[in-house]
Swiss-Prot record:
Its EC number is 2.7.7.6. The keyword Nucleotidyltransferase applies. This is DNA-directed RNA polymerase subunit omega. The lineage of its organism: Bacteria, Bacillati, Bacillota, Bacilli, Bacillales. Belongs to the RNA polymerase subunit omega family.
Length: 70
């Protein structure tokens, strides 16, 4: 079982694609600075820590207003 669960994460961020993108960007930041906002993370990997931050509502995103032309 994954912790945090995908269901609880999708309540915070509505799209799986956006969830992965936000978590990957935050994981990259943590690799460079080694700063995690979660007090005692369960995961030892950066992506897992980023997902825990999203689940704890310590990390969120603001959607872009820019629309991609088709």
């Amino acid at each position: 079982m994954l912790n945090p669960s995908i269901d609880s994460l999708l309540k915070k961020i509505d799209s799986k694609y956006t969830l992965v993108t936000v978590a990957a960007k935050r994981a990259r930041e943590m690799q460079l600075a080694d700063d995690c906002a979660v007090e005692k993370p369960v995961s030892h990997k950066f992506v897992g820590k980023a997902l825990e931050e999203i689940d704890a509502e310590l990390l969120n995103y603001v959607p872009s207003e820019e629309k991609v032309s088709e």
